[in-house]
Amino acid sequence: MPLPAPEIGLVVSYEYLWKRQEQNQTPDKARPCCVIVLYIQSEKDDDPDGPDTIKAVYVPISHVPPDDAQEGFELSPHAKKVAGLDSERQWVVVSECNLDSWPTDIRPIHGKAGQFHYGYLPPGEFTKLKQAFLRFQQMRKLKIVRRL
């Protein structure tokens, strides 16, 4: 199965680098992450024939609740089902993110060779995620790991 097209709300298997691991520059594993922002960065200023690069902002989804230095919310059973995630309790962390080039560090889902995405967060859950994420950004408390 080929890589999916980049889309907002898409949940992919991505080698997320937690802010606390940033010095190591080595993610511990691929995990579900939701693409919350996409934009195109033009390289035309430096090279008129240069390519445009797609940049993505990923937020992590974890079976472990956010710790004291993080904030997030638990996904509803409906959201997990629609997004293609397992039925165990899962949280999306909204207080940190990775900024990376698409599709760098997207990996096949463990046990599903050739499959790179789980599904999509349903609109209601994505809106909740987006609002919480923007709140952290506006308060200037969002922790960004730039992986470019």
Feature map (PLM): residue ranges:
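Short, charged beta-turn/beta-strand-edge "cap" motif at the junction between a beta-strand
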Residues: 17-21
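Compact nucleic-acid interaction/catalytic patches
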Residues: 22-30, 36-83
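C-terminal terminal-subdomain/extension
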Residues: 68-70, 74-148
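Structured loops at beta-to-helix junctions and adjacent beta-edge loops in soluble globular domains
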Residues: 15, 61, 95-97
